[in-house]
A protein has these predicted regions:
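Short glycine-rich substrate-engagement loop in P-loop NTPases that contacts/grips substrate
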Residues: 93-128
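Pre-Walker A (pre-P-loop) alpha-helix and adjacent loop at the N terminus of AAA/AAA+ ATPase modules
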Residues: 20-61
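Conserved P-loop NTPase "ATPase switch" module shared by AAA+ and STAND
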Residues: 128-152
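C-terminal alpha-helical "lid" subdomain
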Residues: 1-25, 212-337
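Structural recognition of the conserved hydrophobic beta-strand(s) that form the central parallel beta-sheet
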Residues: 137, 165-169, 180-187
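Substrate-gripping "pore-loop 1 plus following alpha2 helix"
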Residues: 114-119, 149-177
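Walker A/P-loop
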Residues: 59-97, 122
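A short helix-turn-beta junction within AAA+ P-loop NTPase domains corresponding to the substrate/partner-engaging
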Residues: 195-209
Length: 337
């Protein structure tokens, strides 16, 4: 069965709560009060937005998550939609709408403005009417609500102004007409976002790089996940002192880099790559000393025969299929030289 075509600018659409969205919230290690504050803010909009819209200080249902890359903002935003949907499940389903802001800029004068107006005035209201609750996730929102005061050096500052004006107008209209719609946005560059957009936010939450204790918790969580597939790894996840020592080697890393350290550890030795159950802390420490996956090539590597010996003929494949004409031409050219 063919998947339905999504409207322009819509990256994905999900109906929540759904089991396959459960992991995102727990995957990001942040203080408990951070998650509680985010969930509380989401419920205020999704559950009480219509009543609160009668107040003089109109809520905009807008949350901005700001911080360096790899700090878990987007994953946490998706997880927030799921846990909010779980909290509101008795009152009806929730739609999670992910927007691709990079689809809106256009070289044609005024086209960016029209695209944004179409999204905010037509697409989102139409989708929001389907279910009681709607969460709209906009990643890298700085490309959607460009800071107008810095647009004088842009190729087309007039269009930037018009597009950002359209964002403000659309956000205001949705806040008035659909006050139970929650916008969760993320940015790596908060100074690139228009001041008027930020002033409309009900919550701006800044994320920093993880401290040593948080890094240790991320490492432990990652090892526990690995142990689900290879139970022999579980003792590593329980060795708190070793984990804390490893965390000290990861100072200044973001959460994504810390999680990828486990993958880098698996790739330090061929024995471990073949059988991850043989993973040792020394593999992880070696990977950490090399800054995860960032390494310089050293001496000449051994040949494949030195590594694996002769491969039996019955395991080898013919070399006479699976290539296009260019491949044949390349080999003919080499033979002629």
């Amino acid at each position: 069965m063919a998947q339905p075509t999504l409207p322009p600018g819509v990256l994905s659409m999900h109906v929540l709560p759904a089991d396959h969205h459960d992991k995102d919230w727990d995957a990001i290690i942040v203080p408990k009060q951070v998650k509680e504050r985010l969930l509380s803010q989401a419920l205020v909009t999704l559950k009480h937005g219509r009543k609160l819209s009668q107040l003089a200080g109109l809520p905009h249902g807008l949350v901005v998550l700001a911080g360096p890359p790899g700090t878990g903002k987007t994953t946490l935003a998706r997880g927030l939609a799921q846990v909010a949907a779980l909290a509101l499940a008795k009152e009806g389903a929730t739609t999670l709408l992910e927007i691709n802001p990079h689809m809106f800029p256009s070289d044609m004068l005024g086209e960016s403005q029209r695209n944004i107006m179409r999204l905010l005035q037509d697409t989102i209201p139409e989708i929001a009417a389907r279910r009681p609750h709607t969460v709209v996730l906009i990643d890298e929102v700085e490309s959607f609500a460009v800071r107008r005061s810095s647009a004088s050096f842009e190729t087309n500052p007039v269009d930037v102004h018009r597009a950002t004006d359209a964002v403000m107008l659309g956000i205001d209209e949705i806040a008035k007409k659909l006050p139970s719609v929650l916008f969760v946005t993320t940015t790596n560059f908060i100074t690139a976002i228009d001041e008027a957009f930020l002033s409309r936010a009900d919550l701006v939450m800044h994320f920093a790089l993880p401290d040593p204790a948080t890094i240790a918790s991320i490492l432990q969580h990652s090892l526990e996940e690995l142990a689900v597939q290879w139970p022999a790894v579980l003792p590593l996840a329980k060795a708190r002192k070793d984990i804390e020592a490893l965390a000290a080697l990861c100072s200044g890393w973001n959460g994504r880099q810390v999680r990828k350290l486990i993958l880098a550890g698996l790739a330090q030795r061929l024995e471990v790559a073949k059988d991850p159950a043989q993973l040792k802390f020394e593999d992880l420490r070696e990977a950490a000393r090399k800054k995860g996956g960032v390494e310089w090539a050293g001496d000449a590597a051994p040949s494949s025969k030195e590594l694996f010996g002769e491969v039996p003929a019955e395991l080898k494949h013919d070399h006479d299929h699976g290539h296009g004409e260019d491949h044949d031409h390349h080999h003919k050219t080499r033979r002629m030289r």
